[in-house]
Amino acid sequence: MLQPSRRKYRKEQKGRNTGLASRGTHVSFGEFGLKATGRGRLTARQIEAARRAINRHIKRGGRIWIRIFPDKPISQKPAEVRMGNGKGNPEYWVAEIQPGKVLYEMEGVSEELAREAFRLAAAKLPISTTFVARHIGA
């Protein structure tokens, strides 16, 4: 699964996920893309589950790009531990997603196959998404 190899700090503050995506909003590498229309957090496991769903559907054809990376650690306290006594340990990694961000891209397959593969992938994700195609000349 995806996670950073090393970081300056182990833990990060919660923060707020606001605004629209300003970078990574266009299909840059492939012909078709899966774009987020909602906001939220995608865990490394969810990103991997969606990638597997896409790969299973397109079989050996085509090429896939993952345009997001889980670089934010989420900490949790163990079960049945009293409040206080510091922040919990980092348990998993998430990517903060804003509306407009392209999550996955694909090329080398027909549009129908790409649509179906992205539909299966979107079912694994907790945010709403839409299918987008590259605009030639844009």
From Swiss-Prot:
Region annotation Disordered: where it falls in the sequence: 1-24
CDD domains (alphabetical): Ribosomal_L16_L10e (cd01433)
InterPro entries: Ribosomal_uL16, Ribosomal_uL16_bact-type, Ribosomal_uL16_CS, Ribosomal_uL16_dom, Ribosomal_uL16_sf
PROSITE patterns: RIBOSOMAL_L16_1, RIBOSOMAL_L16_2
Gene Ontology terms, MF aspect: rRNA binding; structural constituent of ribosome; tRNA binding
GO biological process, one term: translation
Compositional bias per record (Basic residues), positions renumbered to this chain: 1-13
Family under the similarity heading: Belongs to the universal ribosomal protein uL16 family.
Description of how the protein assembles with itself and partners: Part of the 50S ribosomal subunit.
Protein name (record): Large ribosomal subunit protein uL16
Record organism: Bordetella pertussis (strain Tohama I / ATCC BAA-589 / NCTC 13251)
Name of the coding gene: rplP
